[in-house]
């Protein structure tokens, strides 16, 4: 009986050693100009983002961030990935964004910056993932249904 237990233990140890795969190795992905490129999405907005080492300048659609996003809340939203990664003022960001409204566009830029930072510095993936910046927010507007006023709102009901 002891021999059977020893052989089963050995079998279990062998299976555990064989089954455990190595963690995926994330490598740096840069273009020929030394920039990391990523696309970010939020609602109907799509942002194409390029990140490179610099002074912290953010340019959106050839305009400065203060001009494009006048609301301070949206500017704070865009800087969140840098704060989570402790890299404020170390990267320049150039992005083009289209579709959706300003809030969706800010979310798309934030998503793109987060992905581009992980391409530039793969070790930043863990803190950004923990902050929820890499995961795409899949919530989109629910479509309007026929026979209803809006997506869920019914027309006013009259009993008589």
Swiss-Prot record:
GO molecular function, one term: structural constituent of ribosome
Intrachain S-S bonds: none
Keywords: Ribonucleoprotein, Ribosomal protein
Taxonomic superkingdom: Bacteria
GO annotations of cellular component type: cytosolic small ribosomal subunit
Any one biological process term the GO annotation gives: translation
Entries under Gene3D superfamilies matching the protein: 3.30.230.10
InterPro entries associated with the record: Ribosomal_Su5_D2-typ_SF (IPR020568), Ribosomal_uS9 (IPR000754), Ribosomal_uS9_bac/plastid (IPR023035), Ribosomal_uS9_CS (IPR020574), Ribsml_uS5_D2-typ_fold_subgr (IPR014721)
Family, per entry: Belongs to the universal ribosomal protein uS9 family.
Record's protein name: Small ribosomal subunit protein uS9
Source species: Xanthobacter autotrophicus (strain ATCC BAA-1158 / Py2)
Classification lineage: Bacteria, Pseudomonadati, Pseudomonadota, Alphaproteobacteria, Hyphomicrobiales
